[in-house]
Amino acid sequence: MKLRYEIWLPHLKFTLQTMSLNYPLNPNEVTIRKYYNFIQNLPIFFPDEPMGNYMSTLLDEFPVAPYLNSRRSFMKWVHFLFNKINKKLNLRTVTFYESLEEYYQH
């Protein structure tokens, strides 16, 4: 039995947004590598195999590596990623600034 995305996806989004908002302004190579490995391994832990496979596809199509050089670019990548997931699930997409407003109202 798979866990419904309505249960786990908001928590994943909150976690990744929190990580991106606290990402270093000027990360060093060790930090970049650790974040890269974390993001690349996320699909393994998705409680819904089709969504995990979709996440793997997104990571192949839109790799995180070029966006790990600054906090702002990582934040924008996380936002972009969740809009892709929302489209796949026929959920509402939001602008970058709307996503920040929603985060801080959480």
Predicted regions and their residues:
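Aromatic-rich, lipid-facing transmembrane alpha helices and their immediate juxtamembrane interface loops
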Residues: 1-106
